[in-house]
Design a protein with these regions (language model features):
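Surface-exposed, charge/polar-rich loops and edge strands
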Residues: 14
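C-terminal non-catalytic interaction appendages of large macromolecular assemblies
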Residues: 96-100, 104-169
C-alpha cells in the first residue's frame, strides 16, 4: 500500500484504521487526518507525536488516562482493546504469579494515586519483570518528569502500532 492510499482515505476510513494508534484516542487520529497529505509513514508518525507535544499538560494526562492498568481488571475481564491485549500478552502479563499480580496491583494503585493517571510503558519493549521494576522505580519521579516519561512511552506504542498497520498491508506495496 503506497502512502497515497492513506492520503486518499476519507475521514471515517482513516479514523477507523488509525483511531487506536494512541490508545482509545480516535480524536488524535481525526486531528492528524486534517494534515494530509503525508509524505511517508515517518511523517505520519511525526504528526501524531507533534499533536501530542502541542497539548497542554492536562491534555497529555487525558491521553494517559485512556490507557488501561497493566495486568489490571480490563485484562482479567477481557475488555482490553485488541492492541493492548496483544501487547500485554507479549510482555508476559497474562502469566503472572499470584505474588506478581498482587505486587503489580498495589503498585498500579499507588502510582495512580500519586500521578492521577495509569502507569504507561511500552509493554512490547519490556517483559513482566522489567515492567514491575520500572513501575517500582518511576513511582518516585516528579510529576513533571513522569508525565514526560509516560508520553515518551505512548510515542513508542504509537510507533509499533503504526508498524503493525503497515505490516497488514498487501505484499509488494510500499509506503
Amino acid at each position: 500500500m503506497e502512502i497515497q492510499v492513506f492520503n486518499s482515505m476519507d475521514y471515517e476510513e482513516f479514523v477507523d484504521k488509525f483511531g487506536n494508534v494512541i490508545e482509545k484516542c480516535p480524536l488524535v487520529a481525526a486531528a492528524v487526518w486534517t494534515n494530509r497529505p503525508f509524505t511517508s509513514l515517518a511523517a505520519l508518525e511525526k504528526m501524531f507525536g507533534d499533536f501530542i507535544d502541542l497539548l497542554p499538560p492536562s491534555g497529555k494526562e487525558g491521553i494517559l488516562r485512556c490507557h488501561p492498568d497493566l495486568a489490571g481488571r480490563d485484562l482479567l475481564r477481557g475488555t482490553l482493546s485488541s492492541e493492548s491485549q496483544g501487547e500485554q500478552i507479549q510482555a508476559g502479563l497474562t502469566n503472572l504469579t499470584v505474588a506478581q499480580r498482587s505486587q503489580l496491583s498495589e503498585l498500579n494503585a499507588s502510582y495512580k494515586n500519586r500521578f492521577h493517571f495509569p502507569f504507561v510503558i511500552c509493554a512490547r519493549m519490556n517483559d513482566k519483570d522489567t515492567i514491575i521494576k520500572q513501575l517500582s522505580s518511576r513511582i518516585h519521579n516528579s510529576p513533571e518528569h513522569e508525565l514526560n516519561t509516560s508520553i515518551a512511552e505512548v510515542k513508542k506504542i504509537c510507533h509499533l502500532r503504526l508498524l503493525d498497520i503497515l505490516n497488514r498491508v498487501p505484499h509488494g506495496t510500499k509506503l
